Amino acid sequence: METSVSEIQIETKDEKRPEAASPQKERQERKTATLCFKRRKKVNKKKAKAGSKTAEETEKHAPEAGGSGQRQPAGAWASIKRLVTHRKPSESAEKQKPSEAEMQPEDGALPKKKTKSKLKIPCIRFSRGAKRSRPSKLTEDSGYVRVQGEADDLEIKAQIQPDEQATQAKSTQGLQEDVIVRDGKEIQESHISNNVISGEHVIGIELELEKESSALRMRTPGSEKEAKVILVKQGVQVQEASVLENSAADSPQPVTSTAPLSPATTHQLGLEEPSDSIRESAPSGKDDGRRKTAAEEKKSGETALGQAEEASSVSQADKSVLSQAEEATVGHTEEATVIQAQSQAKEGKLSQAEEATVAQAKETVLSQAEEVKLSQIEEPAISQAKKATVGQAKEAYVSQAEEAIVGHTEKATMGQAEEATVGHIEKTTVGQAEEATVGQAEEATVGQAEEATVGQAEEATVGQAEEATVGQAGEATVSHIEKTTVGQAEEAIVGQAEEATVGQAEEATVGQAEEATVGQAEEATVDQAEEATVGQAEEATVGQAGEAAVGQAEEAIVAQAEEATVGQAGEATVGQAEKATVGQAEEPIVGQAEETVLRHASDLKVNGVDAEKPRSEESKRMEPIAIIITDTEISEFDVKKSKNVPKQFLISMENEQVGVFANDSDFEGRTSEQYETLLIETASSLVKNAIELSVEQLVNEMVSEDNQINTLFQ
């Protein structure tokens, strides 16, 4: 019942607007409606007999109704006759169809045919007394005929109202059955004659509506669809009361509802208006009495049969219709509403709501266009701003990074340069200082040693040296020492020992030569030599001058010493002694020198006097310091007469009381062997003392230097 009532209510709403706006269309619709009602009333008498014939004829003329408004009533009658036998299933199934057709008006030829089938269902119900369903489905057919017969309906109502009042419902039903018994030709002719007046107008309007519907199907948005469907449901609920009043009052004009019209409902009203006009104009074609009887029959039929039939069919139909309506209304009602809205807009009948929606749509479109323009304008500005900010940030970051890198590199380079320069300066200064100190120490020590030794050696050795001692001792010892020590000196030379050995050798030669030379040499040369050797050894170890530089310095110093000593002390003994000292520079040299001395002493044993064997262990423990032993053998001479004989030498000789000298109280009978033993003893004692002192000093200085170096590295 809800679907049928909704259709009827929509018809009443739509009838208000077209009657006020275009009375001519309402007259045309009423004329066509009156004819339809007359024939339908006649059909109700004999609908079982002529159902098959009319169905065939309506099927033939159904395609013609899609092109013009004349064919629409014929299609409706044919559909009624076809569905008379299948009354109950057809009503429920076709109630669903009209709901879809109402939402899909004027979509083309196919939706028009569907609407005709919807009209067939109400005709069936009207014939049997289900009068509520009949007008609801007639409204669907009248959607196409509305524009055709509005003017004709008004004229027919004015002429036929007195006739309808006089006639009764029975006569109207008899007439309807008679008309149904007639051939389909008469039915079609009656429809055609009623619709001839507005046929041309209907065709033009339908063509326009079809074009508009095809053009606007895709334009309506989904949001409008949902809104329209909701409005249609509200209109249906509001208009149920008005439909009941129309059926009760049975007035010729449709009852209007006070509910506001939506664009979706306006279109459905436009489609369903002719059905109401037809329903009311049919009794006006004969009598007002017929109208009253028809109304009474409608009431009784609707209450009795409608409640029974519609209770089952409408409940099912409502469910299916609502489900299908919701699905179909989304796609089709929008097109229908848009089409009718455009048709009304052409005629100047747009409502305020439509104007508001149009204005809102325009505003939204304009706002969207403005937003698009603004976005297009803002995008380049934003991109430029981004580029500028990115460039500035990059520049700032690069500048900061450069500053940091430059500062860091400057610090690193400065630190490295400072370290390099400091190290270089330290190296250069140390090297220069070492060179200067070494040169100065060498010059001082060599000069002092040369002066002391040369002066003393010249006086003592030259006067004491004789042909015998030089020939015997010089040839034997010097030749043997040269062969052994010079070869060893070439293999290993140490600069630290050379300077000390030169001073010590000079001291030894001075001690062996004379007492004065021994005392002065011990005091002056030994002290100076120790200081010089210690300073030079420290400088050499710290600077690590190198073997080549040391060797060159040694050669120069030795050459100078050789020149002075050779010229002053004697060509043979002094030159050979210096060569021997140069070669004997290391520990093995010391041991070898001692061994050579022992060998030489053993070779020189003439009177059975044995030379003292030096302690090899002590010599090996000593640092590499060369030992110079000058064998200046003195032949027989008077010690008392000689002034240059050292006192220590004499004292040692007196204390030892050697067996050889026991018989000689005046020391006049001393031989060369005796002098040799004395010289060896004195030389060995002097060398031991000097070596011990120098070694201790060197060790202490080395330890102190190592500590200083470690502190610097830490």
UniProtKB/Swiss-Prot annotation:
Assembly behavior: Binding protein for dimer of the RII-beta regulatory subunit of cAMP-dependent protein kinase (PKA) and also for the protein kinase C (PKC) and the phosphatase calcineurin (PP2B). Each enzyme is inhibited when bound to the anchoring protein. Also binds the beta2-adrenergic receptor. Part of a complex containing AKAP5, ADCY5, ADCY6 and PDE4C. Interacts with ADCY8, and enhances its phosphorylation at lipid rafts. Interacts with ORAI1 (isoform alpha) (via N-terminus) upon store depletion and in response to LTC4. Does not interact with ORAI2 and ORAI3 paralogs.
Domain remark from Swiss-Prot or TrEMBL: RII-alpha binding site, predicted to form an amphipathic helix, could participate in protein-protein interactions with a complementary surface on the R-subunit dimer. The N-terminal region, which is highly basic, is required for interaction with calmodulin.
Protein's membrane topology: Lipid-anchor
Residue numbers spanned by region 28 X 8 AA repeats of V-G-Q-A-E-E-A-T: 305-597
PTM description: Palmitoylated. Palmitoylation at Cys-36 and Cys-123 plays a key role in the targeting of AKAP5 to lipid rafts. Palmitoylation by ZDHHC2 is required for AKAP5 function in LTP-stimulated recycling endosome exocytosis.
Biased composition (Basic and acidic residues): 10-32, 54-63, 88-100, 285-301
Ranges for region Tethers NFATC2 to CRAC channels: 697-714
InterPro entries for this protein: AKAP5, AKAP_WSK
Molecular function terms, GO-annotated: actin binding; adenylate cyclase binding; beta-2 adrenergic receptor binding; cadherin binding; calmodulin binding; G protein-coupled receptor binding; GABA receptor binding; glutamate receptor binding
Subcellular location per the Swiss-Prot or TrEMBL entry: Postsynaptic recycling endosome membrane; Cell projection, Dendrite; Postsynaptic cell membrane
Chain residues carrying a lipid of type S-palmitoyl cysteine: 36, 123
Protein name: A-kinase anchor protein 5
GO cellular component: asymmetric synapse; basolateral plasma membrane; cytoplasm; cytoplasmic side of plasma membrane; cytoskeleton; dendrite; dendrite membrane; dendritic shaft
Compositionally biased tracts (Polar residues): 243-268, 310-323
Region (Disordered) location: 1-146, 243-333
Gene Ontology process terms (BP): adenylate cyclase-inhibiting G protein-coupled receptor signaling pathway; amylase secretion; calcineurin-NFAT signaling cascade; cellular response to calcium ion; cellular response to xenobiotic stimulus; clustering of voltage-gated calcium channels; clustering of voltage-gated potassium channels; establishment of localization in cell
Extent of motif AKAP CaM-binding: 74-94
Covalent S-S links between cysteines: none
